[in-house]
Regions:
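Charged (often Lys/Glu-rich) extended helix/loop segments that serve as interaction or gating elements
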Residues: 1-140
């Protein structure tokens, strides 16, 4: 399996950061125990890996990183990155921290077709287990 995410932020300080629209809630292994996942910048597969990035998610946690000091081609806002070998770890280890919703899962079939095997979570899913009974009874 793979996680496909888009670069939506950049930060240029003492380090170069590429911020994705995915986060540790989508793939916990790098944040949890530093697991390595190869990263490909789609459309730049043959470009030189002459930039060094921390590839991060959008959570407010310092360990929300898919890669640290990773040599990659230049990543521009809007580029898609392909995080390899995520297997079944995405959804099974996923969580809703900071109200992050789980993403859809797609299956690439042997004939090249793509099927959605799990839809993305919605806010309705997120709040489905809350019991709002009586919550606003004392508010005037």
């Amino acid at each position: 399996g793979a996680l496909v995410a888009q670069c939506i932020h950049q930060k240029h300080t003492y380090k170069e950061y590429a911020g994705l629209d995915a986060c540790a809630a989508n793939l916990m292994r790098p944040a949890m125990y530093g697991a390595y996942h190869h990263i490909t910048v789609l459309g730049k597969e043959n470009a030189l890996c002459d930039h060094t990035y921390d590839v991060t998610g959008g959570l407010c946690e310092n360990n929300d990183k898919f890669a640290v000091d990773r040599n990659l081609p230049q990543i521009d806002i809007g580029d898609y990155v392909y995080i390899h070998d995520t297997g079944a770890h995405g959804f099974s280890m996923g969580y809703n921290y900071n109200a992050k919703l789980r993403s859809a899962e797609l299956l690439l079939c042997e004939d090249g077709s793509v099927e959605m095997i799990r839809r993305a979570e919605t806010p309705k899913d997120y709040f489905a287990t809350f019991d709002f009974t009586g919550l606003f009874d004392n508010i005037k």
